[in-house]
């Protein structure tokens, strides 16, 4: 289906709450593209806020590890976003046990992910929904941070925010506690959980609901206390919690048997309970984990199937 002089929609490849995604072609280059058609008719006041956010933030960012917004056009009263075509995602790769990947491959994927996240944070943008199926692969093996439907500008210190963001399994403890003020540290927590999942090849903190998510998180990583996170006990739900000790280093070694000491340091830095002590994207990128052998794989050499 020809949608304007420059683009053709070829087949539907996905559908979400506010958009339908088509595989398409850019005529002038022959390039494969994805066309995200925003369902404006679904919303009485016009565009859904998620669509507005996605357009706003993708227009502001150009980076090799962030999905590229190529163009925007209107057709039949619908807004269409033209995005680079990214054939698969990290969730598919983790789940497909026929795909074998190495510690060097994981290191390459983490490096690309953190470069994309750092670019967001450097531009004062919180992603707020980092998870494996929002990390997409380009045909040459680059990981691209995608889906900015929950993104927002990093807030002023006293600005009140919703804590109902980030897919549950990747939600930082401050969000689980219902914090109304938070920082880019929420994205780093999500990356830490993704790293653990890559090493285990199963979900690391799979809570069944919001209450169970707290139980699962603190059973795995220890219940935070005022000693390591001042005033954490002032959150309303804190007194209902079971107190679990943090895992010992030996317990972490047994859980993550292929992880080096630097890899465990790297993971623990991202999964620090106190958001003010949690590593930043810069600290992650400067970690000894990336300096030790093996070096990160060349992304184009990693064999993944679509």
Curated annotation (Swiss-Prot):
Binding site for ATP: 13-21, 36
Alphabetized Pfam families for the sequence: Pkinase (PF00069)
Note: Present with 4400 molecules/cell in log phase SD medium.
SUPFAM superfamilies: Protein kinase-like (PK-like)
Family per record: Belongs to the protein kinase superfamily. CMGC Ser/Thr protein kinase family. CDC2/CDKX subfamily.
Compartment list: Nucleus
This enzyme's EC code(s): 2.7.11.23
UniProt lineage: Eukaryota, Fungi, Dikarya, Ascomycota, Saccharomycotina
Keywords: ATP-binding, Cell cycle, Cell division, Kinase, Nucleotide-binding, Nucleus, Phosphoprotein, Serine/threonine-protein kinase, Transcription, Transcription regulation, Transferase
Catalytic function, reaction form: [DNA-directed RNA polymerase] + ATP = phospho-[DNA-directed RNA polymerase] + ADP + H(+)
A single GO cellular-component term on record: cytoplasm
GO MF term list: ATP binding; cyclin-dependent protein serine/threonine kinase activity; protein kinase activity; RNA polymerase II CTD heptapeptide repeat kinase activity
UniProt name for this protein: Serine/threonine-protein kinase KIN28
Record carries keyword Phosphoprotein: yes
Post-translational modification: Phosphorylation of Thr-162 regulates the affinity of interaction between CCL1, KIN28 and TFB3. Thr-162 phosphorylation does not vary through the cell cycle and is necessary for full kinase activity.
UniProt record, GO biological process: 7-methylguanosine mRNA capping; cell division; cellular response to nitrogen starvation; nucleotide-excision repair; positive regulation of Atg1/ULK1 kinase complex assembly; positive regulation of autophagy; positive regulation of transcription by RNA polymerase II; positive regulation of transcription elongation by RNA polymerase II
Quaternary structure and partners: CCL1 and KIN28 form the TFIIK complex, a component of the TFIIH holo complex. Component of a complex consisting of KIN28, CCL1 and TFB3. Interacts with TFB3. Also interacts with HNT1 and HOG1.
Phosphothreonine modified-residue sites: 162
Organism listed in the record: Saccharomyces cerevisiae (strain ATCC 204508 / S288c)
Main location: nucleus
Keyword Transcription regulation: yes
């Amino acid at each position: 289906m020809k949608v304007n002089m420059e683009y053709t929609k070829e087949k539907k490849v996905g559908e979400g709450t506010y958009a339908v995604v088509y595989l398409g072609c850019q005529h002038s280059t022959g390039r494969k593209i994805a066309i995200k058609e925003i369902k404006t008719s679904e919303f009485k006041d016009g565009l859904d806020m998620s669509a507005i956010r996605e357009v706003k933030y993708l227009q502001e960012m150009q980076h090799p590890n962030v999905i590229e917004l190529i163009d925007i056009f209107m057709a039949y009263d619908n807004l269409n976003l033209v995005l680079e075509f990214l054939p698969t995602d990290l969730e598919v790769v983790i789940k497909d046990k026929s795909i074998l990947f190495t510690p060097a491959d994981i290191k390459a994927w983490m490096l690309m992910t953190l470069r994309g996240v750092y670019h967001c944070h450097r531009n004062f943008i919180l992603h707020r929904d980092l998870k494996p199926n929002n990390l997409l692969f380009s045909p040459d093996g680059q990981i691209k941070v995608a889906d900015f439907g929950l993104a927002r500008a990093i807030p002023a210190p006293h600005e009140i925010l919703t804590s109902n963001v980030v897919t549950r399994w990747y939600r930082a403890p401050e969000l689980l506690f219902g914090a109304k003020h938070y920082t880019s540290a929420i994205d780093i927590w999500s990356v830490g959980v993704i790293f653990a999942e890559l090493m285990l090849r199963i979900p690391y903190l799979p809570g069944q609901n919001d209450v169970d998510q707290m139980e699962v998180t603190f059973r795995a990583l220890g219940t935070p206390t005022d000693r390591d996170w001042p005033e954490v006990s002032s959150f309303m739900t804190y007194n209902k919690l079971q107190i679990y000790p943090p895992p010992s280093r030996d317990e972490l070694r047994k859980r993550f048997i292929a992880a080096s000491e630097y890899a465990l340091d790297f993971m623990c830095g991202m999964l620090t309970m106190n958001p003010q002590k949690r590593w930043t994207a810069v600290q992650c990128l400067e970690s000894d984990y990336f300096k030790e052998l093996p070096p990160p794989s060349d992304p184009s050499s990693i064999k993944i199937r679509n």
